[in-house]
Amino acid sequence: MSSIWPPQKKVFTVGFITGGVTPVMVSFVWPAAQPQKKINYSRKKKYFRPRSFYKKNVSF
């Protein structure tokens, strides 16, 4: 069992790094590659509109 544990830990750490760090890297790199104005418009469309829809659904 002791010989099996080190590879499992390595695989787990690699899976955690690829699954957790790469999305964060993309979230920082992708907006930086795009123009600032497009980022602002996309953020408003993605975040502000859904919130208004959620509020309307809750009120009904």
From Swiss-Prot:
Q: Which GO terms describe its cellular component?
A: host cell membrane; membrane
Domain of life of the source: Viruses
> What subcellular locations does the record give?
Host membrane
Could you list the residue ranges that cross the membrane? 11-33
Provide this UniProt record's keywords sorted from A to Z.
Early protein, Glycoprotein, Host membrane, Membrane, Transmembrane, Transmembrane helix
- Induction note: Expressed in the early phase of the viral replicative cycle.
Name-wise, this protein is Uncharacterized protein DP60R
Q: Can the keyword Nuclease be found in this entry's annotation?
A: no
- How does this protein sit in the membrane? Single-pass membrane protein
Q: Which residues are glycosylated?
A: 40, 57
